[in-house]
């Protein structure tokens, strides 16, 4: 006996096939080409209706995840017989789950079953009594929307997609701002070349162009809102003796248009940076406290989502962003990179030399814990206490490695060590003597002689040890060479013996003939 389990938007349908070995048929596609053949081949053995739309969503998710719900288990238990029957299922995970139940079914799910399901789905309204094509389409559409909403799990506070887009836009804005600022300095530099050396800030440079216009207006222009007083004086004095060429009003208008773009871009960049900061504090407060908004946002963007990053181990977080260097190192059998995007974290930046790698490893481990709390904790608060605690521990480790106090995170204050004040010595007049007795030898000279002897002895010991090591290496090499020579000699002798034997055998054969 063969059954086909069909999941519809209305409920579970268990179809009984008239041919027991339908899934083994060689002409299956031809047999199920028309509605008459399908209706003749399959009949509804049992149907379990969904109670509501919520129930339909729950059952559909169970099938997608490869789980057997209580409703489906009940349907299969009622349909099972004493003889072992074949059950055709569409999902491999679901087939494995049904097998584990221990029901009297031989569960089948392979490429052939797809043809059966294609035919059943096409003529499903005709197979199910009291079900029209329109009703089934409406139910399927409603269920599809419900599954889509369930998968998205939309929440205004936990949309990491916004972070990914914001950090990508922020990087693009930085590139555009740098390009525009460089072009503006080069363009206006023909008229007032000294200004770029005095005012290095791009936004301030653009605002001066908008306020001042041509350099001849510098003396009458008030720049106190843009520049400090001493720099303003330098700009005005440089404008009087500038080596730049004169420009027309049309040129100035175009330069001003570019300067306006720079000012607007800078204002929008600041607004976007504040938005990203607030989003990061809402979505990943602990990660933000530990590595900062920008590094945290780049990690999330690189991983694809907060949950994907939270699932990653600390070793992956440590080298995230250095994939090219990692695979190049593995290919060439060199040392693998110690850090990726975490290199830009302030804590790694405070470390020096070889300590950077150690701090990156510690920071990655703490970031993994903070991320899992941010992404997966049910009763999470947005205070970022776990991130602060983790940062304090990383700072403590950094201070220990660097040998100086680098802690910035507030910590429980310990009792200050008491300072002991010792009495000053009385003045010793005898110590002012110009000369000391000739026969009295100072104790310091004896100590120095002993130290010199000790240093010489250490040097001799080291030299002797080096010589012994060199001799040992030479002896090892000579032994190895002797062994290799012996092996070569033995191989040569064996080869010669073999050749002699073969010649002898050939000679004997010839004589016999």
Swiss-Prot record:
PANTHER family: NUCLEOLAR PROTEIN 5 NUCLEOLAR PROTEIN NOP5 NOP58, NUCLEOLAR PROTEIN 58. It is found in: Nucleus, Nucleolus. Keywords: Nucleus, Ribonucleoprotein, Ribosome biogenesis, rRNA processing. The lineage of its organism: Eukaryota, Fungi, Dikarya, Ascomycota, Saccharomycotina. Residues 429-443 have a biased composition (Low complexity). SUPFAM superfamilies: Nop domain. This is Nucleolar protein 58. Required for pre-18S rRNA processing. May bind microtubules.
